[in-house]
């Protein structure tokens, strides 16, 4: 089980990403627009840089919803490989069966 502080940190990052998503998208659209003046583009760059660092979605880490494990997480299920196997063997995940050929 991951430390509770690390799990809370990830939740805080997720909240920040959600909070600033619209503003980030707006600034990135201004930057990407070829008709934007150089002054406006520079201002948009500066505003984008002044947003909180953790508001960027790249800083988020996929974690297991049960254990908080950061590695070996299947994003389709939101579970780490160990918990995924455990639940699949018990038949608690619909549509997952043990391979046999």
Curated annotation (Swiss-Prot):
The keyword RNA-binding appears for this protein: yes
Tell me, which GO biological process terms does this entry list? translation
Q: Domain of life here?
A: Bacteria
A Pfam family that this protein carries is Ribosomal_S14
Q: Which UniProt keywords apply?
A: Ribonucleoprotein, Ribosomal protein, RNA-binding, rRNA-binding
Q: Name one GO molecular function term.
A: rRNA binding
GO CC annotation: what is one? cytoplasm
> Quaternary arrangement and interactors, per the entry?
Part of the 30S ribosomal subunit. Contacts proteins S3 and S10.
Q: Which family does it belong to?
A: Belongs to the universal ribosomal protein uS14 family.
Q: According to its UniProt entry, what is the function of this protein?
A: Binds 16S rRNA, required for the assembly of 30S particles and may also be responsible for determining the conformation of the 16S rRNA at the A site.
Put simply, this protein is called Small ribosomal subunit protein uS14
Natural source organism: Thiobacillus denitrificans (strain ATCC 25259 / T1)
